[in-house]
């Protein structure tokens, strides 16, 4: 249950960062994963993605986004079979990168790399 998913996830992640630093982890060994799909509704996931650039601006750590083949993509597209969500997964990866994600976890590496190369070459982002 979230009343403000973005704020609550950011606060949770900051708590985890603080705990890691107190436990002696080097800051350069940390990255953040907002946990798309884990205990969140479709709207929560959409809000997190739409707010990604905003909340990342307040973080000193790289962000990993893993939405490949997720249920949220099936809910948006109406495609029930995860393996058939490649196009949606590539689109979500591009949206994540466009919003500043440092790392994207994907199943369809070749297809995602092709899409990223096209976006880079066409100047969608540098």
Label each residue range with its predicted role.
Residues 36:
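Acidic/histidine-rich catalytic cores of soluble enzymes
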């Amino acid at each position: 249950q979230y009343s403000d998913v973005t704020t609550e996830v950011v606060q949770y992640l900051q708590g985890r960062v603080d705990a890691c630093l107190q436990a002696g982890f080097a800051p350069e060994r940390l990255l953040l994963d907002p946990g798309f799909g884990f205990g969140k509704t479709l709207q929560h996931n959409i809000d997190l993605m739409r707010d990604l650039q905003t909340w990342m601006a307040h973080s000193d750590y790289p962000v990993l986004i893993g939405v490949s083949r997720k249920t949220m993509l099936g809910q948006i597209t109406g495609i029930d079979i995860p393996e058939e969500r490649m196009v949606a997964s590539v689109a979500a990866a591009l949206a994540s990168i466009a919003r500043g994600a440092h790392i994207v976890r994907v199943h369809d590496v070749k297809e995602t790399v092709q899409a990223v190369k096209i976006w880079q070459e066409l100047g969608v982002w540098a």
